[in-house]
């Protein structure tokens, strides 16, 4: 793996590129993302996520740059106002974490990995049970005398 050394000034520049990417997401400016070849899947998925959470905002909690890679830990906050993964809007305010790894080459994001806590979101929406917790009401059998939830 090519591990070229960057100066602190260059680290700031690579972090700023990721910062501008996150700002463009918050502003729903998906066209600005198209200049980064590593963001193709993000450009495809984000309109779906932003339709479910139109007021979604990103707060960078921690960011580290090493070589040409920037690692970002961020918090996402938004109101569930549109369908998401088949779940109708709940108008519930949600917060979840996301970890990003971005590789920057010549000022462009060429590789982007995002790991969002979607299981946590689904638990908060009552779609899946928390580990060790009870099944959400919507998954429990309506007839309490039955065998419980069924799986298709």
Regions found by a protein language model. Name each.
Residues 1-152:
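C-terminal and inter-domain tail/linker signature
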């Amino acid at each position: 793996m090519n591990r070229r050394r960057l100066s602190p000034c260059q680290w700031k520049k690579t972090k700023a590129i990721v910062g501008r990417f996150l700002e463009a997401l918050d502003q729903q400016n998906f066209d600005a993302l198209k200049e980064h070849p590593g963001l193709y899947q993000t450009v495809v998925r984000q309109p779906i996520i932003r339709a479910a959470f139109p007021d979604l905002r990103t707060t960078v909690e921690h960011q580290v740059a090493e070589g040409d890679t920037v690692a970002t830990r961020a918090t996402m906050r938004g109101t569930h106002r549109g369908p998401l993964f088949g779940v109708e809007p709940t108008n519930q305010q949600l917060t979840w974490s996301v970890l990003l790894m971005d590789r920057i080459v010549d000022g462009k994001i060429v590789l982007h990995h995002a790991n969002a806590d979607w299981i946590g979101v689904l638990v908060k929406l009552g779609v899946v049970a928390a580990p060790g917790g009870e099944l959400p009401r919507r998954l429990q059998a309506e007839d309490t005398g039955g065998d419980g939830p069924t799986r298709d």
